[in-house]
Amino acid sequence: HGGLDIRGFSRALVSNLQGGDVQGASTLTQQFVKITLQENALKRGDKDAAKAAVDKTYSRKLQELKYALNVEENFTKDQILEGYLNLVYYGDQAYGVEAAALNYFGVSAAKLNLGQSALLAGIVQQPTAYNPVINPKESQARRDVVLDRMQSLGLASAKDVTAAKKVAVKK
């Protein structure tokens, strides 16, 4: 695992310097750092620091990268992923996987089934587009992509994936 995606960072930098669409190149660790900085600032009541944590500036991105490299040195991939999933936005005013599980399914994250877990994993990429409350078809399609990927990685059996896909996502 690495704190910097060199190819993505270079692509985004060139595009941004050429005046094209503003692009990001954040690794999951960089996103975790950004969310953590913003969350800590909000807890302190420091609105300026919360805004600065997400500003689209090169200086902020470099600071984020420095922190991300430090996080990578001091935490395992699993610890970083856990921290990220406990802070990230899942849509519908749900921040963190526990809040999302309760919000969308009425159960704690520990009690999610395979299909529900895959749906929440898929939401993170685009919380509004894949929100099952407002976009159930898109959410279901994304869930199915995640299920297929889980199967291809050996994290779920074909039987379990087929069963999970049979459950429709409803508003």
Task: Give a label for each model feature.
Residues 1-157:
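Peptidoglycan glycan-strand catalytic modules in the bacterial/periplasmic cell-wall system
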Residues 157-171:
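Non-catalytic structural connector segments
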